[in-house]
């Protein structure tokens, strides 16, 4: 059976918000806003299909921006995806959603729509813009009514870590189908997320307790434990056990960079991971993605180079978040700054 390969495709930088932690403007607040032309979008699409044909994968697209719905050819692109029967998720804003728009998305084959909540009302609106918090929670209902799975993602940093339990309550009350959080990735060397390792472990413990309480009460929200440090936490608490008979040198879980995804920006630049700022490997208008995968991407598959993880029994299952490590040090294989495990 073929496995899916995901393309996170940023079709435009256009957006109704200017979030303080946005990667688009992280190093250049006066950056020109790029958008991919319809001709280039078709070229990109067929390059991705060629990749999947060569490597025997099924394509899956995460269409994003900016806010992708602002692209003048957004609906035309969805028509192309529908023509080929390819499933997709939208990562976008809430501001242009209503029942009719969400139903139209569903008709084109949209499976999930991901929104962001990055704090309780005051903090979230400070990150994004006034009114964003309430609008985001309100639009969860539009997404659900259309039969699309509503996903809420939180980016955790020192600014909002204390609010995460409250965010979970708000998201559950709004009826979100899925909730997940990941850590903010510093966007140039020596920046820090401002979270001590044991403080982050405590967040996982607090959330684990809350998730279990909601699940026991029949809550329908699925809590996606996205951060790979959950594996370490569950290993310590006995929920996760290393299976017997595992193959030496085989990777069974953890970060998927170099395994099953690529990121494409509006300029055509291809990144191993959007959150790793120095991970540009190609340009989709100039390079064949199928070749990039077995050439330039090899540098992200040398698991023996992980400075700390290579000495840990969880290497094949965890590896933390290399993007966070890279954001702090510039080194993809450096120690995850929030990993609390002592490894000798």
Model-based region annotation:
Residues 1-111:
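Conserved alpha-helical substructure of the radical SAM core
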Residues 2-3, 25, 29, 270-344:
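Flexible mid-to-C-terminal extensions adjoining Fe-S/redox cofactors in radical SAM and related proteins
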Residues 25, 64, 116, 182, ...:
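Conserved residues at the C-terminal ends of beta-strands
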Residues 27, 96, 120, 158, ...:
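Positions that flank functional sites
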Residues 66-68, 94-95, 119, 252, ...:
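Active-site metal-binding loops of divalent metal-dependent hydrolases
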Residues 18, 57, 109, 175-177, ...:
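Short loop/turn motifs at secondary-structure junctions
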Residues 41, 200-203, 289:
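Hydrophobic/aromatic residues in well-formed alpha-helices
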Residues 10, 31-32, 36, 108-112, ...:
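Radical SAM enzyme [4Fe-4S]-AdoMet core and its adjacent flexible, acidic
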């Amino acid at each position: 059976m073929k496995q899916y390969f995901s393309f996170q495709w940023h079709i435009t930088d256009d957006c109704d918000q200017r979030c303080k932690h946005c990667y688009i403007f992280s190093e250049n607040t006066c950056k020109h806003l790029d958008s991919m032309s319809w001709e280039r979008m078709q070229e990109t699409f067929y390059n991705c299909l060629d990749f999947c044909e060569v490597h025997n994968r099924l394509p899956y697209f995460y269409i994003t921006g900016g806010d992708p719905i602002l692209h003048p050819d957004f609906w035309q692109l969805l028509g192309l995806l529908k023509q080929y029967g390819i499933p997709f998720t939208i990562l976008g804003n809430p501001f242009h959603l209503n029942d009719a728009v969400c139903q139209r998305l569903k008709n084109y084959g949209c499976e999930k729509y991901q929104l962001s909540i990055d704090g309780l009302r005051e903090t979230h609106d400070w990150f994004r813009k006034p009114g964003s918090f309430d609008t985001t929670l309100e639009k969860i209902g539009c997404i659900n009514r259309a039969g699309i799975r509503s996903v809420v993602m939180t980016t955790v940093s020192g600014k909002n870590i204390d609010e995460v339990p409250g965010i979970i309550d708000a998201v559950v009350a709004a009826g979100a189908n899925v909730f997940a959080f990941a850590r903010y990735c510093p966007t140039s060397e020596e920046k820090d997320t401002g979270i001590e390792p044991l403080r982050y472990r405590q967040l996982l413990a607090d959330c684990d307790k809350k998730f279990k309480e909601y699940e026991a009460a029949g809550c329908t929200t699925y809590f996606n434990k996205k951060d790979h440090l959950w594996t370490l936490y569950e290993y310590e608490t006995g929920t996760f056990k290393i299976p017997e008979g595992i193959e030496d040198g085989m990777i069974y879980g953890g970060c998927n960079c170099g395994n099953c995804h690529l990121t494409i920006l509006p300029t055509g630049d291809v990144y191993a991971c959007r959150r790793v700022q120095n991970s540009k490997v190609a340009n989709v208008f100039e390079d064949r993605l199928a070749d990039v995968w077995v050439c330039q991407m090899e540098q992200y598959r040398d698991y023996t180079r992980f400075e700390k993880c290579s000495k840990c029994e969880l290497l094949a299952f965890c590896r933390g978040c290399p993007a966070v490590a890279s954001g702090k040090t510039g080194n993809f294989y450096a120690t995850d700054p929030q990993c609390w495990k002592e490894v000798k």
